Amino acid sequence: MRHARMAIGKGEVVCIPTDTSYALVADAFNPVALDKLRAARRMQDRAPLSVFLPGIPTLNALAESVPEEVEALATEFWPGALTVIVRAGETLAWDLGDTAGTVALRMPANRIALELLSETGPLAQSGAFALGQSPLVSPTALAKRFEDSVSVIAAAGDEKTGKSLSTVIDATSLDSPQGKLRIVREGAISSLEIFRVVEADRFA
């Protein structure tokens, strides 16, 4: 973990396991590191990046506001395979790409990921796989795929990681009187599980 932490501090890209799949991460507040992350994933220059965070208190620090529905979902499903899109705090000194003032946040349910996040703070992230392809789960395959663009690959060890995707919920419309949540992508957490926490009529 020390090598991963040091690499992040130097503005490098690191590959870490999560509860859904391996992810490439970099310092969310370092524009050079973000460029390296996009290059590793072969993304366009302004492609938006999402953010891993170490806990719910960081959600409150990064979001302009946290609607009660988002707080309820985070309390129930974090750490876990839930990504929430909220309005980003206006004073944050970062540039995550063409996000229109929003940020996608998740607290992964993986000991290795959370240990790193507890030491580094929020990390920009993108899945360690090419668009349209299945996530890579072997450190050997990851090393071969990202050998020229990733400084450290943290093996999952006895931590479970898979090939699933997180469920993504957009809460950015809740700042208007008639605004509703929207399920952008149904992944590892089903809509039925979501509706047990927040009633279905709160969704568009």
Predicted regions and their residues:
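Active-site-adjacent structural elements in enzyme catalytic cores
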Residues: M1-A204
